[in-house]
Amino acid sequence: MKFKSELEQAIIATVQQEVVPALGCTEPVSLALAAAVARQYLGALPDRIEAKVSPNLMKNGMGVTVPGTGTVGLTMAAAIGAIGGDPNGGLEVLKHITNEQVALAKQMINDHKIEVSISDTEHILYSEATLFNTDQQVKVRIAAHHTNVIYIEKNGELLFSKPCVVESENAENVFANLNAKDIYDFSLNVELEKIRFIQQAAILNSALSQEGLNQDYGLHIGRTLQKQIGKGLISDDLLNRIVIETTAASDARMGGANLPAMSNSGSGNQGITATMPVVVVARHVAAGEEQLIRALFLSHLMAIYIHSKLPKLSALCAVTTAAMGSCAGVAWLLTGKFEAISMAISSMIGDISGIICDGAANSCAMKVSTSVSSSYKSILMALDDTQVTGNEGIVEHQIDRSINNLCAIASRSMQYTDRQVIEIMVSKPKSL
């Protein structure tokens, strides 16, 4: 396929929009940003905060550590966002918080000055923060995208408002007339200088991986597996290096490390999963700079392409689809053939389809390790001319039809699963 300049620009712009640095899990960070913007307009520290979030944002914010705080949950996200957040920081809103600000945030929580509840909203991704101080109050709403401020109100006066397309209405999609082969062709033929920016993903996520290997964050799965090599319980082979280095980055990410991840489709874990396997394999095969750049771009673009067929947040764990992106990048590094990519992604769909998202938490790193392991296993099968075929399950003989089947299940059939997961999570007894 020959790409017109307008389409080329649109594809690159989409990647630049979806692959951005993010400090901390993006759902609680979205609420922190709403609170930071509200604080900017309030002009003073709040006495109390009322926050409302969509059910999916509640799911993804309940169990994850807010970076730089050592504390889990949306109450901390709202508090530290209001006290120390940078309203212009986007997904790095908490980059410059101090220990003193964290202490103030914890005091507000202990004094029961913060309330977070579920909003009855049409938006899958929605956060609202209302800050109160003496006789003043400011309300800020974010919807559809993690940093998309749609409403600002102060003391009952509307200061800013813009329409927000509901996700299900599907605004124009740059991928509407593209398929997986087009994604492959574009990544290999676009001018190198136009996609060189993707190298930053390797830099940021590699630093996060090293942090996860140096300290015990979250479940410290990557670090634990690394130790087992020294004990002779697992081998120091390419599969385990992929799993260890990718999972370590997720450990650090979910465990509150004060380092940004390069995200993909609004998720740090998806960005990590689309990046680190490519970095590890590129190092293993001594890939040149251009090979690494194109493999990274192919990985991230394929991940975005697949995710564009999904709701922004859903019951399907999206690191599984991000791993299909890195599957493309790694398969290209090892074979240079689209056929291997098609076979491997088909096998992944036959393997890990339907893994649920039960909220952002330290255990996300487990799903990351499972997904990248499936990816590499599927690539090895493709190298031996073996794959899950179109005669099995939801896999079809054509890769895009298989992808569409997976995304249809996530978009429609798993909606009830999502409601059930959220119901279970919000009704669990508090831990002692």
From Swiss-Prot:
Signal peptide from the UniProt entry: none
InterPro entries in alphabetical order: Ser_deHydtase-like_asu, UPF0597
Single Gene Ontology BP annotation: L-cysteine catabolic process to pyruvate
Coiled-coil residue windows: none
Record GO terms (molecular function): L-cysteine desulfhydrase activity
Disulfide bonds: none
Family affiliation: Belongs to the UPF0597 family.
Record's protein name: UPF0597 protein APL_1605
Species this protein is from: Actinobacillus pleuropneumoniae serotype 5b (strain L20)
